[in-house]
């Protein structure tokens, strides 16, 4: 009855949070329809412009969607796997109450699909069965939807962060969204990391002595 697509974005970023998107599709509501938004695919395979165009239609097409995040500090303190599980838990809690209640009342009627090769959900889904599928963000529409929602939400947050903190301008976060780039690495080497950087991810760039 419920297909729950799950995907993460920002896992490999040097700065900013990691985000987990969840998209729930209720089969009885969609009644076998295949009219998902045109161009919907893995968020990493489509342009930022198209992702922005898809953001609202995707949220309207699915039964429910939500995004949870874990901060750079939480990633440093807990590790990326725990941070992903925490983000998933937060995303689930952000789903509408009626959807969460319906799934909780009949967990055997739900199936979660997680993109990747490793199940980092932990106990986030409780008794709901989950399967891990490589390239699910490309091949499963529910996971593609989760990927787009998470990517747009995280990108917007990074842009807002960069706008609110002029001191972040040398790092180019508005453009690189926290990922590695020549300008980003050069700024790290010249200015050092900020509170928004994942210090445990910078040892190869800066060395332990410069970080801790």
Model regions: which residues?
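RNase H-like, Mg2+-dependent phosphodiesterase core
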Residues: 1-212
């Amino acid at each position: 009855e419920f297909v729950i697509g799950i995907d993460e974005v920002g896992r490999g970023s040097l700065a900013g949070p990691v985000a987990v998107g969840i998209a729930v599709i209720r089969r009885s509501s969609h009644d076998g329809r295949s009219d998902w938004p045109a161009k919907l695919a893995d968020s990493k395979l489509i342009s930022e412009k198209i992702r922005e165009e898809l953001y609202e239609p995707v949220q309207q097409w699915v039964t429910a969607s939500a995004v949870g995040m874990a901060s750079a500090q939480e990633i440093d303190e807990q590790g990326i796997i725990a941070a992903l599980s925490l983000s998933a838990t937060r995303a689930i809690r952000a789903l509408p109450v009626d959807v969460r209640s319906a799934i909780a009342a009949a967990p055997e009627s739900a199936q979660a699909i997680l993109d990747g090769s490793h199940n980092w959900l932990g106990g986030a889904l409780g008794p709901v069965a989950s399967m891990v599928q490589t390239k699910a963000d490309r091949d499963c529409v529910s996971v593609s939807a989760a990927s787009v929602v998470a990517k747009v939400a995280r990108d917007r947050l990074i842009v807002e962060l960069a706008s609110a903190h002029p001191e972040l301008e040398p790092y180019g976060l508005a453009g690189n969204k926290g990922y590695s780039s020549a300008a980003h690495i050069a700024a790290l080497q010249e200015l050092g990391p900020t509170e928004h950087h994942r210090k445990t991810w910078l040892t190869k760039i800066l060395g332990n002595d410069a970080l801790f």
